[in-house]
């Protein structure tokens, strides 16, 4: 879940910078100089949309380390770190890709995998998770994160976000142009966008961006089921993953990081639309019914 939230926040920041830069450089004035050029607008939206998502992907590992204070284990200094590194090595080898970086950080029970590719990935585990589960359960969580990497979930998320970014920019500019044209009623023939265009485009980008995040979270929840199934396959047994999920469910909400509580682990209702993970009971049921 931390992986998805960090990606979305980074994507928002990058898109904001690119959008403001485009406005300063006069791209919007060019697009509306002789009426709205739909073809050029679509190209512009795709360049900014996919550019923003791929920049976010490239920054994902660095941002994850910075935001959590995760320390990569280069030389294990304890038996716990030796076990952690060797477990990730064994699981990644079984999955068929080079061992990712392994990091540990102080915090509530959590773990995540991130990185732009299998060969440049990171698996990070919190001390809270290591101390609240037995080793078999921790191994199942690690297998889950390794499965995320093996399934290419970060790249999939990037492509989905790129498409959504494109539509957010494209539709917001069209609506902004229509609003601006209505407000000005041809009183300004210069073709330069007015204040109505800027306000409307920013408002629409925020609104459509929120709606787009719901779509991203929907796909994220689907990928979680695949990662659970992948963990069961890597472990050769679905029981450890089920036990790990139940262990998470037995923790008090106050022991969980905020993003876990917002992911359906300790909440529901409308917020479920913005959850990166399905409810624990649904994940457990899916594992128990798998053949």
Swiss-Prot record:
HAMAP family: Pept_M48_protease_HtpX (MF_00188). GO terms for biological process: proteolysis. NCBIfam families: PRK05457.1. One of its GO terms (molecular function) is zinc ion binding. The keyword Membrane applies. It is an enzyme of class 3 (hydrolase). Keywords: Cell inner membrane, Cell membrane, Hydrolase, Membrane, Metal-binding, Metalloprotease, Protease, Transmembrane, Transmembrane helix, Zinc. The lineage of its organism: Bacteria, Pseudomonadati, Chlorobiota, Chlorobiia, Chlorobiales. Binds 1 zinc ion per subunit. Gene3D superfamilies: Metalloproteases ('zincins'), catalytic domain. Its cofactor is Zn(2+). PANTHER family: PROTEASE HTPX (PTHR43221:SF1). It holds the Pfam family Peptidase_M48. InterPro entries: HtpX_protease (IPR050083), Pept_M48_protease_HtpX (IPR022919), Peptidase_M48 (IPR001915). It is found in: Cell inner membrane. This is Protease HtpX homolog. Its main location: membrane. The chain crosses the membrane at residues 4-24, 38-58, 159-179, 199-219. Zn(2+) binds at residues 144, 148, 224.
């Amino acid at each position: 879940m931390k992986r998805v939230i960090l990606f979305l926040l980074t994507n928002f920041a990058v898109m904001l910078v690119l959008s403001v830069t485009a406005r300063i450089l006069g791209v919007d004035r060019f697009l509306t100089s002789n009426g709205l050029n739909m073809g050029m607008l679509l190209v512009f939206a795709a360049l900014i949309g996919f550019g923003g998502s791929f920049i976010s992907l490239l920054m994902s590992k660095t941002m994850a380390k910075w935001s959590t204070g995760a320390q990569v284990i280069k030389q294990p200094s304890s038996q716990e770190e030796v076990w952690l590194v060797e477990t990730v090595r064994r699981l990644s080898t079984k999955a068929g890709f080079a061992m990712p970086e392994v990091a540990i950080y102080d915090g509530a029970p959590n773990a995540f995998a991130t990185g732009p590719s299998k060969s440049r990935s990171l698996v990070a585990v919190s001390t809270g998770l290591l101390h609240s589960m037995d080793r078999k359960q921790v191994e199942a969580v690690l297998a889950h994160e390794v499965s995320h990497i093996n399934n290419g979930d970060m790249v999939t998320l990037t492509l989905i976000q790129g498409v959504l970014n494109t539509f957010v920019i494209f539709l917001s500019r069209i609506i902004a142009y229509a609003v601006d044209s209505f407000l000005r009623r041809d009183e300004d023939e210069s073709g330069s966008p007015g204040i109505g265009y800027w306000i409307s485009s920013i408002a629409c980008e925020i609104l459509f961006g929120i709606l787009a995040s719901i779509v991203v979270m929907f796909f994220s929840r689907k990928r979680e089921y695949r990662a659970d199934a992948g963990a069961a396959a890597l472990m050769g047994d679905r029981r450890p993953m089920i036990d790990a999920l139940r262990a998470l469910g037995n923790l008090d909400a106050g022991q969980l990081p905020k993003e876990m509580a917002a992911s359906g682990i300790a909440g529901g209702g409308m917020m479920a639309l913005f959850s990166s993970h399905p409810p624990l009971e649904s994940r457990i049921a899916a594992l128990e019914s798998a053949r």
